[in-house]
Amino acid sequence: MKKTIYTLLTIAMAICFANCEKAILEEGIGKEKQGKGKMKTISLRINEEITTSETPLFANKTRGAGKKLYGINVFQKKASNSSYTKYAYGLFDDPSKISIVLNENCLYRFECLIVEEGEDNLYLSEDGYMEPFITTSKKPTKVNNSFTKSSSVNFPFPPKGQTTITGNKQVWCPKLIKQYGTLLNFDPKTANTVSLKVKRAVFGLHLTIAPPEEGTLEVSYLDDYKETIKASDPTFDHQAVYSFTQTAKAIEDGYNGKFDFVLKWTKSDGTIKTETKAFVLKRNVMTNIKIVIKNPAPSSIAIEEESSEMTNEDIDWTVER
């Protein structure tokens, strides 16, 4: 009889412990679900910059529809955290496909770089696009039109170094258009669409170089470019839109950069004359620089800057011998 009672008590206790264990497990699952929160698909709408200076910047040049690439970083901040951490990144060429699933219990920060190819194209290797779309793991990125979730890898935005263009050539100021923007503290509970504003980080340069009366004239500018004009050549006339190197700073209104233009004139008798002049090139402004070498001596440099609104500027650089 005692044995039977002991057996019944053992069974009852086992059932009780099993129920308690089940309750504890279910409670843990419930908390985990609550911690994960509700997931929501969010679309991104990129608002590109349109300003009154756009027409003057591109007025004298037919602007073709260059290929656009959209590089996007997404950062997440959980309720228990005070700072953002890497969440996802992706490279797109179709803006209609830019969407991502987010947790409604978290806040998000977005970062976007648009590169619109122009006279220069980005270098595309077998493994993907190079700078400015090399990841923090030093790898090229392919266009997948989708996000890759990662807590350790993304794009090292904002870019502030060289850009790799066709031919695997690295330049500081490529002849293409970069736009950049960020958005902080987006709450997925408040909207189904992220509206992210980007601004251009570009300047225009219209360079005119008259051929020298004799010999050869070389003009080096923007660290990577050199034009060579002989006495028998026609006037050099070229206009392009370039991107600044310091992208984050260059999207600010009124931003400008100072660049050295180096002139080297080799005369027929082998005599070499050099001149260096720094010019200020302004964001969203097409600057016209005209370089002329003429007589008589002494050497001088004449600079004439337009005093009207900063949309189009003329600068004459005359070197007299």
Description of each model-found segment:
Residues 1-7:
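Bacterial N-terminal signal peptides that target proteins for export
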Residues 4, 16-52, 284, 311-321:
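Bacterial Sec-dependent N-terminal signal peptides
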